[in-house]
Amino acid sequence: MIFDQQIIQGDRPENKQCIIYFSCDPQYWAEYGQYLARSTLYYNGKQSHVHVHMIYEEGQEHSMKHLIKNASITYTFERHPKDFYDQFQLNKEHPVFARGPEICGTKNDYDLKRKIYLSSARFMLMNKLFDHYQHVLQIDADGICRNTFAIHDFKRITRQPCAMRKPKDPSVYIASCISPGIGSAGSEFKTELANKMIDAFKKPIYWFIDQHVL
Protein backbone atom coordinates (compact mmCIF):
# COMPACT_ATOMS: atom_id res chain seq x y z
CA MET A 1 0.00 0.00 0.00
CA ILE A 2 1.16 3.51 -0.78
CA PHE A 3 -1.25 5.71 1.17
CA ASP A 4 0.96 5.68 4.27
CA GLN A 5 4.13 6.36 2.27
CA GLN A 6 3.10 9.58 0.56
CA ILE A 7 5.31 12.63 0.39
CA ILE A 8 3.58 15.50 2.16
CA GLN A 9 4.37 18.78 0.43
CA GLY A 10 3.84 22.41 1.39
CA ASP A 11 4.56 24.33 4.58
CA ARG A 12 4.16 23.08 8.12
CA PRO A 13 2.97 25.66 10.69
CA GLU A 14 6.36 26.00 12.33
CA ASN A 15 6.72 28.25 15.39
CA LYS A 16 2.94 28.69 15.66
CA GLN A 17 1.50 27.93 19.07
CA CYS A 18 -2.31 27.93 18.72
CA ILE A 19 -3.61 26.22 15.58
CA ILE A 20 -6.99 25.48 14.00
CA TYR A 21 -6.50 22.48 11.69
CA PHE A 22 -8.67 20.91 9.03
CA SER A 23 -8.36 18.99 5.78
CA CYS A 24 -10.34 19.00 2.54
CA ASP A 25 -10.21 18.64 -1.24
CA PRO A 26 -10.57 21.61 -3.66
CA GLN A 27 -14.34 21.22 -4.00
CA TYR A 28 -14.89 21.15 -0.24
CA TRP A 29 -12.51 24.08 0.12
CA ALA A 30 -14.59 26.13 -2.34
CA GLU A 31 -17.89 25.17 -0.70
CA TYR A 32 -16.92 25.19 2.98
CA GLY A 33 -13.25 25.27 3.96
CA GLN A 34 -12.47 28.76 2.76
CA TYR A 35 -15.28 30.16 4.90
CA LEU A 36 -14.03 28.37 7.99
CA ALA A 37 -10.55 29.76 7.30
CA ARG A 38 -11.78 33.30 6.55
CA SER A 39 -14.04 33.47 9.59
CA THR A 40 -11.30 32.14 11.88
CA LEU A 41 -8.81 34.67 10.52
CA TYR A 42 -11.36 37.47 10.82
CA TYR A 43 -12.14 36.84 14.48
CA ASN A 44 -8.92 35.25 15.70
CA GLY A 45 -6.18 35.85 13.14
CA LYS A 46 -4.05 37.87 15.54
CA GLN A 47 -3.91 35.19 18.22
CA SER A 48 -4.20 31.90 16.34
CA HIS A 49 -3.09 30.20 13.14
CA VAL A 50 -5.00 28.16 10.55
CA HIS A 51 -3.42 25.10 8.95
CA VAL A 52 -5.11 23.35 6.03
CA HIS A 53 -4.13 20.01 4.53
CA MET A 54 -5.32 19.86 0.92
CA ILE A 55 -5.96 16.58 -0.88
CA TYR A 56 -5.61 16.67 -4.67
CA GLU A 57 -6.31 14.11 -7.35
CA GLU A 58 -4.24 13.54 -10.49
CA GLY A 59 -4.19 16.66 -12.67
CA GLN A 60 -5.12 19.07 -9.88
CA GLU A 61 -2.52 21.69 -9.00
CA HIS A 62 -1.73 23.37 -5.70
CA SER A 63 -2.12 27.05 -6.64
CA MET A 64 -2.39 29.98 -4.25
CA LYS A 65 -4.74 31.76 -6.66
CA HIS A 66 -7.45 29.41 -5.39
CA LEU A 67 -6.44 29.73 -1.73
CA ILE A 68 -6.09 32.46 0.91
CA LYS A 69 -2.81 34.35 1.15
CA ASN A 70 -2.28 35.37 4.75
CA ALA A 71 0.62 35.15 7.20
CA SER A 72 -1.71 33.37 9.63
CA ILE A 73 -2.51 30.42 7.37
CA THR A 74 -0.34 27.60 6.00
CA TYR A 75 -1.00 24.69 3.68
CA THR A 76 0.34 21.19 3.22
CA PHE A 77 -0.92 18.92 0.49
CA GLU A 78 -0.85 15.46 -1.06
CA ARG A 79 -1.59 14.49 -4.65
CA HIS A 80 -2.93 11.10 -5.68
CA PRO A 81 -2.37 9.05 -8.83
CA LYS A 82 -5.48 7.95 -10.71
CA ASP A 83 -5.52 4.46 -9.19
CA PHE A 84 -4.86 5.62 -5.59
CA TYR A 85 -8.19 4.42 -4.18
CA ASP A 86 -7.90 0.98 -5.76
CA GLN A 87 -5.66 -0.05 -2.86
CA PHE A 88 -8.59 0.11 -0.42
CA GLN A 89 -11.27 -2.53 0.13
CA LEU A 90 -14.76 -1.85 1.44
CA ASN A 91 -16.10 -3.76 4.43
CA LYS A 92 -19.61 -4.37 3.14
CA GLU A 93 -20.28 -6.86 5.92
CA HIS A 94 -19.81 -4.31 8.72
CA PRO A 95 -23.06 -3.59 10.64
CA VAL A 96 -22.95 0.17 9.86
CA PHE A 97 -21.75 -0.10 6.25
CA ALA A 98 -25.19 0.68 4.81
CA ARG A 99 -25.11 4.12 6.42
CA GLY A 100 -22.10 5.10 4.31
CA PRO A 101 -23.79 5.27 0.89
CA GLU A 102 -26.73 7.05 2.51
CA ILE A 103 -24.60 9.73 4.20
CA CYS A 104 -22.13 10.11 1.32
CA GLY A 105 -24.84 10.20 -1.32
CA THR A 106 -23.24 7.53 -3.50
CA LYS A 107 -23.35 3.78 -4.07
CA ASN A 108 -20.26 3.87 -6.27
CA ASP A 109 -17.41 1.95 -4.63
CA TYR A 110 -14.71 4.34 -5.91
CA ASP A 111 -16.51 7.45 -4.68
CA LEU A 112 -17.26 5.84 -1.33
CA LYS A 113 -13.63 4.82 -0.79
CA ARG A 114 -12.54 8.33 -1.69
CA LYS A 115 -14.93 10.01 0.73
CA ILE A 116 -13.95 7.67 3.56
CA TYR A 117 -10.28 8.48 2.94
CA LEU A 118 -10.94 12.23 2.72
CA SER A 119 -12.68 12.17 6.09
CA SER A 120 -9.86 10.23 7.78
CA ALA A 121 -6.57 11.38 6.23
CA ARG A 122 -6.22 14.33 8.64
CA PHE A 123 -5.78 11.93 11.57
CA MET A 124 -2.95 10.04 9.87
CA LEU A 125 -0.88 13.21 9.60
CA MET A 126 -1.03 15.08 12.90
CA ASN A 127 2.15 13.47 14.20
CA LYS A 128 3.95 14.69 11.05
CA LEU A 129 2.51 18.20 10.95
CA PHE A 130 2.61 19.43 14.54
CA ASP A 131 5.26 19.66 17.25
CA HIS A 132 4.80 18.67 20.89
CA TYR A 133 4.42 22.27 22.12
CA GLN A 134 1.69 23.30 19.65
CA HIS A 135 -1.90 23.65 20.83
CA VAL A 136 -4.03 22.16 18.03
CA LEU A 137 -7.79 21.98 17.56
CA GLN A 138 -8.80 19.73 14.67
CA ILE A 139 -12.30 20.38 13.33
CA ASP A 140 -14.47 19.51 10.33
CA ALA A 141 -13.98 21.75 7.30
CA ASP A 142 -17.68 22.63 7.11
CA GLY A 143 -17.65 24.54 10.40
CA ILE A 144 -17.46 28.29 10.83
CA CYS A 145 -16.03 30.65 13.46
CA ARG A 146 -18.60 33.05 14.93
CA ASN A 147 -16.66 34.97 17.57
CA THR A 148 -13.32 35.78 19.15
CA PHE A 149 -12.13 33.22 21.68
CA ALA A 150 -9.92 33.90 24.68
CA ILE A 151 -6.48 32.48 24.05
CA HIS A 152 -6.19 31.17 27.62
CA ASP A 153 -9.41 29.18 27.07
CA PHE A 154 -8.06 27.77 23.81
CA LYS A 155 -4.85 26.65 25.52
CA ARG A 156 -6.78 25.15 28.43
CA ILE A 157 -9.05 23.15 26.14
CA THR A 158 -6.20 21.91 23.96
CA ARG A 159 -3.70 21.08 26.72
CA GLN A 160 -4.76 17.42 27.06
CA PRO A 161 -5.90 14.88 24.45
CA CYS A 162 -9.67 15.27 24.18
CA ALA A 163 -12.58 14.82 21.79
CA MET A 164 -16.07 16.21 21.37
CA ARG A 165 -18.96 14.14 22.69
CA LYS A 166 -21.84 13.34 20.38
CA PRO A 167 -24.63 15.82 21.25
CA LYS A 168 -27.39 13.19 20.99
CA ASP A 169 -25.36 10.54 22.83
CA PRO A 170 -22.73 12.01 25.22
CA SER A 171 -21.28 8.56 25.87
CA VAL A 172 -19.90 8.55 22.30
CA TYR A 173 -16.85 10.55 21.19
CA ILE A 174 -16.88 11.89 17.63
CA ALA A 175 -14.05 12.83 15.29
CA SER A 176 -15.54 16.19 14.28
CA CYS A 177 -13.58 18.08 16.93
CA ILE A 178 -10.51 16.76 18.72
CA SER A 179 -7.34 18.05 20.30
CA PRO A 180 -4.25 15.84 20.49
CA GLY A 181 -2.92 17.81 23.47
CA ILE A 182 0.65 18.99 24.08
CA GLY A 183 3.80 17.57 25.64
CA SER A 184 4.52 13.85 25.87
CA ALA A 185 0.83 12.96 26.20
CA GLY A 186 0.06 14.87 23.01
CA SER A 187 2.93 13.27 21.11
CA GLU A 188 1.83 9.79 22.19
CA PHE A 189 -1.78 10.48 21.23
CA LYS A 190 -0.88 11.80 17.76
CA THR A 191 1.39 8.85 17.04
CA GLU A 192 -1.04 6.23 18.36
CA LEU A 193 -3.99 7.75 16.48
CA ALA A 194 -2.01 7.92 13.23
CA ASN A 195 -0.77 4.34 13.55
CA LYS A 196 -4.19 2.93 14.41
CA MET A 197 -5.85 4.84 11.55
CA ILE A 198 -3.23 3.60 9.09
CA ASP A 199 -3.66 0.03 10.35
CA ALA A 200 -7.44 0.35 9.97
CA PHE A 201 -7.09 1.40 6.33
CA LYS A 202 -4.94 -1.64 5.59
CA LYS A 203 -8.07 -3.66 6.29
CA PRO A 204 -11.52 -3.30 4.67
CA ILE A 205 -12.97 0.15 5.44
CA TYR A 206 -16.39 1.73 5.96
CA TRP A 207 -17.91 5.10 6.82
CA PHE A 208 -17.50 5.88 10.56
CA ILE A 209 -14.14 4.07 10.69
CA ASP A 210 -12.44 7.25 11.92
CA GLN A 211 -14.83 7.54 14.87
CA HIS A 212 -14.45 3.88 15.73
CA VAL A 213 -10.65 4.17 15.71
CA LEU A 214 -10.87 7.27 17.90
What residues fall within each predicted segment?
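Aromatic-acidic/polar surface patches that form glycan- and anion
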Residues: 22-33, 115-119, 203-207
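A structural signal for well-ordered alpha-helical segments within the folded catalytic domains
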Residues: 34, 38, 120, 124, ...
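Surface-exposed cleft-lining segments at the edges of enzyme active sites
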Residues: 107-115
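Catalytic core and acceptor-binding pocket of nucleotide-sugar-dependent glycosyltransferases
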Residues: 184-214
